[in-house]
Amino acid sequence: MTTETRPEEPTPISDRAWKALEGAYDLQVHVGPDVIARRIDDLDCAKEFLAHGMKGFVLKSHYLQTGERAQVVTKAVPGSRVFGAITLNHSVGGLNPVAVELAGRTGCKIVWCPTVDAANETAGRLDGGSAKLPFWAKIQRELAAEGISPPPLSVIDEAGRLTDPARHCLERIAKHNMILATGHVGRAEIFALVRGAKELGVKKVLVTHAEFPSQSLTGDEQKELADLGAIIEHCFTTTYTNKAPWEVAFANIRQTGVSRTVISTDLGQTINPPVADGFAMFAQRLLDAGFSDADVRTMAVTIPTRLLDE
């Protein structure tokens, strides 16, 4: 997910960067068909990944479960591996364990906690102001204006404990060995989720785009979450669109450790680079900052493959 912040100039991509991404998986791709206009569709994105030696990606929609789409793409583009996911916004019933259960039965690999309907993310988005909004915020305002937008969602109660609906969703995630991704919830919610996931038997937890403004986790917080068992995700769009400095993201990766980090693009927006190119630009940035080829492969190939296949 990205707002309409002015992006930087594209980074020239070397053969070395493409080589480092051979066999890579992007765990957060926003392509079409979708409620929001996208730069590319599922099929063409899978073909572009294969053409560059990358393996596949996870389809993220803020609104709809993507398990069925993923199965069709994987069959239609031989050699690709595309996976589905679900995001627990109001369009799927919010923190709805039935939706999680059926996503698991459909082969979905990631369950994102609320994003566009997260109380942490929607604060100030739906009540006017701010001419520059994320694409999704415009849709949320339209739904609110039509009187069909329920209250924002939180995974914790006033005492900071996971709510019963959140716990029930985590139980379904554990049952199907899916990846719990923290979405756009706030700092206290992220820590509650990571701790609760361990208690409820969830084996794979991904802290979503750690530097994104609505999360804005410090290096110390990211390391603490990794110490609790989470993998920390860093997304290309966050830094490319100037929501966080590259140097901060690189420092956070070094502090947490490459072995507990994944890189994703969060791409697919019409105004941003193509998904495959953005992934390679991210790899190039890391290489230019002194990370090794092996480091990039760990974050783009080894850990994503393990998360998807275990």
What are these regions (language model features)?
Residues W18, A70-G79, E101-G107, E171, ...:
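Acidic (Asp/Glu)-rich catalytic clusters
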Residues N89-L95, A181-G186, A210-S216, C235-W246:
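Active-site glycine- and acidic-residue-rich loops that bind
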Residues F279-E310:
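Mid-to-C-terminal alpha-helical segments outside catalytic/metal-binding sites
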Residues T2-G79:
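An N-terminally biased module of ancient metal coordination in phosphate/nucleic-acid-related enzymes
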Residues G93-T208:
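Extended substrate/RNA-proximal surfaces in nucleic-acid metabolism proteins
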Residues A24-D26, G56, R81-F83, K109-W112, ...:
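Structural preference for beta-strand elements that scaffold enzyme active sites
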Residues V35-R39, G67-R69, N96, F191-G196, ...:
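Histidine/acidic-residue-rich catalytic or RNA/ligand-binding cores of hydrolases
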Residues C235, V258-V275:
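Short acidic/histidine-rich active-site segments
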